[in-house]
Amino acid sequence: MTDADGVLREYPEDGGSSLREALSDILGAEAHFYRMTLKSKEYELFDFSMFVESEYGNAPEPVIPGVPEDALGEEILWRLMSATKKNPVSEEYELSLDAGVAIGDGRATAVYAETNDDGGINLTEIHFSTDDTGLITIIKSGEAETVMTFERGRRHRAVYHTPYMDFDMRLFAARVENTFTPGFGGEIHLDYALEIRGAAAHRTVMTMKFEPEEI
């Protein structure tokens, strides 16, 4: 559902209880429910028109002298991400939905579900340590699947699987902050660049807020 400002707002009013039951089945008896509000802003870093041929294949033309063009180096990413602060947002959305959270052995897993246009269910799992606030793994399953690792100041590879083709991606996280506290909720902040090899790159600034909602 989209509001008058073009901001996407979830969640379907019907079927909420059945989805909660499904999340409970996934997480087990220790699941606790939170109301999760996800806000995301996306900025375009570059598109295909900025690519040049090189010995490494298609790669973005270097914007910093002396930096090799085998891919976007971290120096280039920092420069491009800083420049987007002056650019208009290319995509913005907000979700509000139920998320189940289970905690054990110093690890936390948050799971939420979304319905797609065909009526199917897409699941997103967020895995993190309750001690290490600078590392988060997000697993998406359903019509499209991927495993994404966000580690502050580090670059990680990911593959985005779709029914049509797979996309090779690189993720570079400039900011990973996590204030989640069991029983009290909290917020997860991500600021990262996502490069789709041979296509484009975007910067995403995302906040996930968890508020306890026990039933």
What function would you assign to each model-found segment?
Residues P182-I215:
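Mixed-charge, glycine-accented linear interaction segment located at domain edges/termini
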Residues E42-S49, T115-E125, A144-T149, D168, ...:
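Short, surface-exposed beta-strand/loop "edge" segments at domain boundaries and coil↔beta transitions
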Residues G15-L23, G120-L123, I136-E143, M165-N178:
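Charged, amphipathic alpha-helical segments
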Residues M1-E61, P65-A83:
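Polar/acidic, low-complexity leader/linker segments enriched in S/T/G and N/D
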Residues E30-R35, D70-I76, G104-V111, G134-T137, ...:
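Short, hydrophobic/aromatic-rich segments at coil-to-beta transitions
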Residues S141-H189:
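Acidic, glycine-rich flexible loop segments
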Residues G57-G73, V89-T146:
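Short, well-structured hydrophobic secondary-structure segments
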Residues D98-V101, E125-F128, R175, L190-L194, ...:
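Hydrophobic/aromatic beta-strand elements that line small-molecule binding cavities or substrate pockets
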